Amino acid sequence: GVDVIELGVQSFDEEVLRLSGRGHHADVVYQSAALIQDYGFTLGIQLMIGLPGDSLQKCVFSAEETVKIAPKIARLYPTVVLRDTALYEAYQAGSYTPLTEADAVERTKAMYEILDNAGIQIIRVGLKSSDIMAEETAFHPAFRQLVEGSIARDRLEAQLTELLASLPVTQASHMPLQESAVEVGIKFQAADRSVVFAANQKSYNNLFGHRGCNRIYFASKYPALTIRYLCDSSLPDGTYRVFSPSDDNA
């Protein structure tokens, strides 16, 4: 029997719904979601990024509203433009501009983190190549990896910055008080040339990013460091750890 019902909400913003011709108001979503949950079904919410009238702020709003109704699962889809559709006509007329790939990743990343932090399982990010005929669109066959790799980079760098800042000042007393990240990395080299980036098997590829973009980024920005990559099965999905091999707690 049916145990999961997903709502193709697309957006909680009234203007986006109107401009996209969705034919419903946001209040219908809240009512429908409550009924689905009251009858014991598992609720899923589908959201689209980059519809007419959309913005980063509206995407964040939609993700926050999704958290309020507490679905178990969610899907995030960047808008694609297909020929012989009203959206394609708007694109041809210049009244609709598709998101760039970079913008689509940034907006989706913001939504992903809101949902993920709330414990909502994100079962799909982007479309499969078999789902569409790619046209003028932000479609990328590895869109989920682009998003999750970007999230991984942010989380890794935040931990790396904290690790480097915790080093004894005496190791680089000749340096100015306000040091750049690279200068701090050079200071770190004097004590230990290596740091370790770790994730579990499922999230391991996100350490490197799509086509190794994260590896390239860190190697370029922190040339004084040797970064090793570790698969750690004790870490939860989407959790990344940065540490020094000499760390007693490693």
Summary of predicted features, one role per range:
Residues G1-T79, R83-D103:
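Conserved non-cysteine loop/helix-boundary elements of the Radical SAM core domain that shape
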